[in-house]
Amino acid sequence: MVPVVALVGRPNVGKSTLFNRLTRTRDALVADFPGLTRDRKYGRAEVEGREFICIDTGGIDGTEDGVETRMAEQSLLAIEEADVVLFMVDARAGLMPADEAIAKHLRSREKPTFLVANKTDGLDPDQAVVDFYSLGLGEIYPIAASHGRGVLSLLEHVLLPWMDDVAPQEEVDEDAEYWAQFEAEQNGEEAPEDDFDPQSLPIKLAIVGRPNVGKSTLTNRILGEERVVVYDMPGTTRDSIYIPMERDEREYVLIDTAGVRKRGKITDAVEKFSVIKTLQAIEDANVVLLVIDAREGISDQDLSLLGFILNSGRSLVIVVNKWDGLSQEVKEQVKETLDFRLGFIDFARVHFISALHGSGVGNLFESVREAYDSSTRRVSTAMLTRIMTMAVEDHQPPLVRGRRVKLKYAHAGGYNPPIVVIHGNQVKDLPDSYKRYLMNYFRKSLEVMGTSIRIQFKEGENPYANKRNTLTPTQMRKRKRLMKHIKKSK
């Protein structure tokens, strides 16, 4: 399960600044959803190759009376969803009554909480945080979120201990892997393969979308039942339900983010739709079905959720629900809108269905299998290098400082999503347009469908870069005599 970190504190203590720095963006990856407090943001972040979800809660009112209400409305929900809470205070403003009230609430929870003193730039950190020890939350971590000072230390001391279950990417000797495969292929031998067989594993399938777009109806239709489930896994409200199923002799695990879902029992919009459940289901899935309401069209929330799916690198199938009952004219308008707003993801299949009546639902699984097979397909180093060579022959890389960028070889760097690692000289100077050209060339050459391809570039380091020449004693004596001769000639 992907860890969840909540940022809590008074207004203007720097929560959004820290959120943007952690998620490396200037806004939330997933925008506000109907039924949820508007000023809560959700984003995807990473530290040392380990992923986590960050929640930016709105500022809590500055009065003790207001704290109780606002905590119940939004911040308390974020705390319950989180694995770790970062309680932020303003070192410049000093200790405030609202800080004490918030700390009182946090101490009553058994949630790991860490006190972060922001805006310590230009101050003596030890002196600036001394008053906050009275909050009784242990060690204080001074940072300057706007400049990034102390943020890395905060991540290492707070987040990494809670991420043992999310292992970083394995480091391999990529050059050795390349030459081993190349030599084996030149000798007519089969390249060594690992024991991983993606076809032997069930496909984890997540159905996500905004409230009331028909996710539960589609889930019921797939399972052939009148209800999704009448029980939930024990734990917090962010637990999702994993439902094993089989279709056409292929095993699946359906990830249900709806929680307890007896029809007519749930009326609270927040209870119906949990952003955290959705984000964690996306991270855990192999293939994501993004459900869109044909009658409402694509909203900004749909695009924000789509952005999170793409950033997570998951395979994607777009499902346009409630297609029945629309006139032909309206259907054409919907298709034109889809082409216009989703033109940047031409690799994803789009299905028009009616989950209520079942039309088109059976065709979804063909696209799901296609997307899964594309994302887990093993491609040899020799083939990737040949494709790279053909791409270079069709369109040469640009000149950088008068020299042509040289691409040497390519190999697989990961799967789900497929990652192609290209080694060469001056590859860091390649323009984005040429990188997109290479990505599209690989996708078309490999006939990848339902998943994006990521291209990573690695450049050989110059061992003499930023190093002064070291002279032998004989060379030093010659240099000394030469310098004396130059001075005399002047």
From Swiss-Prot:
Q: Does the keyword ATP-binding apply?
A: no
Source species, domain of life: Bacteria
An example GO biological process term is: ribosome biogenesis
- GTP-binding as UniProt keyword: yes
Q: Extract the GO molecular function terms from the UniProt entry.
A: GTP binding; ribosome binding
* InterPro entries referenced in this protein's UniProt entry, alphabetically: G_ENGA, GTP-bd, GTPase_Der, KH_dom-like, KH_dom-like_a/b, P-loop_NTPase, Small_GTP-bd
Q: Which residues form the EngA-type G domain?
A: 3-166, 203-376
User: SUPFAM superfamilies from the entry?
Assistant: P-loop containing nucleoside triphosphate hydrolases (SSF52540)
The entry marks the following residues as binding GTP 2, namely: 209-216, 256-260, 321-324
Which PANTHER family does the record associate with it? Answer: GTPASE DER
Q: What is this protein called?
A: GTPase Der
Naturally occurring in which organism (per UniProt): Salmonella paratyphi B (strain ATCC BAA-1250 / SPB7)
Identify the coding gene: der
